Amino acid sequence: MATFVELSTKAKMPIVGLGTWKSPPNQVKEAVKAAIDAGYRHIDCAYAYCNENEVGEAIQEKIKEKAVQREDLFIVSKLWPTCFEKKLLKEAFQKTLTDLKLDYLDLYLIHWPQGLQPGKELFPKDDQGRILTSKTTFLEAWEGMEELVDQGLVKALGVSNFNHFQIERLLNKPGLKHKPVTNQVECHPYLTQEKLIQYCHSKGISVTAYSPLGSPDRPSAKPEDPSLLEDPKIKEIAAKHEKTSAQVLIRFHIQRNVVVIPKSVTPSRIQENIQVFDFQLSDEEMATILSFNRNWRACLLPETVNMEEYPYDAEY
């Protein structure tokens, strides 16, 4: 079983990475160090997570210790949509690179397709609490990102939270120089994303699954929300393989050739989440897990629902 996915650029992206969304700055440094010690080589970051400085410290410490070399790591970050204008894009990218203490990124993604008004706030709002949008679109942002590739600062580009119509528009953009190599989206047994994955793979675009465990620690979680980790059928499959529910949920993606980035700051869980290459889910088990789909999203970004380009209005 391959431990990586080959991108359209021929680069190898490790199929399991460490997610860092919601990892508090005071804990994320130790989490990244624990992950590198456990064998992770793919770290998923973002400007909007406000913890890249600590992630960078961890990476540098591990490189200094000779535990790992920079070229063995696959580091991903994301451009927030308040920075779609070229000048702001360059500044945001530079901040990410400086915080991570790197001289290049392996992959740089557009975090969200809707352009937002530039400024200090991640979600700029007017007096009525309505989100303020920007006229600069993701297509214009892409041109600025392509320049980063041409300058050798980024190896590959991708998108996140895009539906297939938005990807189609990007692929059909006149003068497109660098195609997206991945679409990072929420994906788990309650949101199996079959049509979107099929579409992306048909275009030579890999898929990365975030919130693979259902994001139980998300800020908007409600007590009545479904819990993947507590799902009796998932627990049953896990018990059969002498694995945990989390390991089954991660393995589910690997067998679909989908990159998966579980988040944890607990060293024992970080280790557990990568111990997923020594068992195989049967075709029957995969079909059972796929049948759990209910198009349930943990991460809706409700602030932007009534704006143009809201990605989840489309079926996929």
Curated annotation (Swiss-Prot):
Highest taxon of the lineage: Eukaryota
SUPFAM superfamilies named in the record: NAD(P)-linked oxidoreductase (SSF51430)
First-tier enzyme category under EC: oxidoreductase
Binding-site positions, substrate: 111
Catalytic reactions on record: an alditol + NAD(+) = an aldose + NADH + H(+); an alditol + NADP(+) = an aldose + NADPH + H(+)
GO molecular function: aldose reductase (NADPH) activity; all-trans-retinol dehydrogenase (NADP+) activity; NADP+ binding; NADPH binding; retinal binding
Coiled-coil segments on the chain, per record: none
Residues at the catalytic site: 49 (proton donor)
GO biological process: polyol metabolic process; retinal metabolic process
Gene induction: By FGF-1.
Residues engaged in binding NADP(+): 211-273
Presence of keyword Cytoplasm: yes
The keyword Ligase is assigned to this record: no
Enzyme nomenclature, EC number: 1.1.1.21
Cellular location(s): Cytoplasm
Residues flagged as site, Lowers pKa of active site Tyr: 78
Record's GO cellular component terms: cytoplasm
Keywords: Cytoplasm, NADP, Oxidoreductase
Gene3D superfamilies with a match to the protein in the record: NADP-dependent oxidoreductase domain (3.20.20.100)
Subunit structure, interactors included: Monomer.
Recorded family membership: Belongs to the aldo/keto reductase family.
Protein name (record): Aldose reductase-related protein 2
Gene for this chain: Akr1b8
